[in-house]
Structures are given as C-alpha cells and as structure tokens.
Regions:
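Surface-exposed, low-hydrophobicity beta-strand/loop segments enriched in small/polar/acidic residues
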Residues: 1-167
Length: 167
C-alpha cells in the first residue's frame, strides 16, 4: 500500500480547522448571508446578533471569535444557486487552538509565544480586513495586536499557523 512519508512533520492543517479538539469552547452562531466571510479562520464580530466579518475601520475590541471550518456545510455559492436567501448557522471559536492563514510575515520563522495581529483597516487583495498577520503594518492602527491570542510555533510556507485564542 503506497502512502506518504513525513520526514519532518505533518502538515499544519486547514485554515479554520480546530487543531486541539479537547481544549476549546465553540458556540453556534447565526451567519448573515448578506455579509459573508471570505474564508474560514477569519476574525469576526457581532452585529444584530449575527456573527459577521470585520469591516475596515473596526477596532480590535470588536473581535469576538474566529470562524471555524464546519463539516458538513453547504457553501454560499450552492445556496445562492438553489435560490436560498436565508442565514446559515456557523461556529465561532471563543477559546481554543485553531489553524489560521497569516497574510503578512514569515510563518516558518514564527516562534511559540509570538504576538498575532489582526488587520482592521488598510486591507488589500492579498491581506483583506479580518485576516491575521505576524508583523504589524507601518501604520500600526491597521494591524493592532490581538492580546488574547498568541502563536504556537512555526507555520507552513503558505502562511498557515496555529494560534491559541483566549487560553
């Protein structure tokens, strides 16, 4: 039987996936179908009792969790194709360990305990608002530190890292 041999370590995981399922608190949330997250593993806030992505100009204190990658789920594109215009239920990581994709900084050289920052303004196509970054922008207000989170060690070359959130 053919297989893969991991000579250094196994892959980090999928962005938005919980990495340590024993030590966590996840709450079910209503997602707003008119304000969709671009991907899993992004920081979110509450607006009108719905968990939605951050918007440019939000402050770091608005961050109330991380969107968890659920299974199974029907994608927004599939729901739109079927003509469903209702809010979905999703998962919000309130406390625990999760894999996220950082859009600035070098994930393989990250160290355990390093700070993690969240883009709240100055978003670009490569680093949109709500993503996690390892290094703050030159304009520090764009990427404030999320003091309730820290890195758990080096990540993958494509930017995936494990963070501890509210631990």
């Amino acid at each position: 039987m053919a297989g893969n041999a991991y000579l250094t370590r196994m892959p980090m995981g999928i962005a938005g996936a919980v990495t340590r399922p024993r030590d966590l608190t996840i709450e079910p949330v209503t997602l707003d179908h008119q304000k969709q997250f671009a991907s899993y593993g992004l920081a979110g806030k509450y607006v009108n009792d719905k968990f939605v992505p951050l918007e440019s100009g939000d402050t770091i204190d608005k961050v109330k969790g991380v969107l968890v990658r659920p299974y199974p789920i029907t994608s927004y594109a599939d729901l739109a194709y079927l003509g469903v215009n209702a809010n979905q239920v999703g998962d919000n990581l309130k406390r625990g360990y999760i894999c996220v994709k950082v859009t600035a900084g070098t994930a393989p050289s990250a160290k355990k305990g390093d700070p993690i920052y969240v883009r709240v303004a100055g978003g670009t196509a490569g680093s949109p608002v709500g993503t996690f970054v390892l290094t703050p922008d030159a304009t520090a207000e764009n990427t404030p530190q999320l003091v309730s989170a820290e890195l758990m060690g080096p990540g993958e070359a494509d930017g995936r890292v494990e963070i501890a959130f509210n631990i």
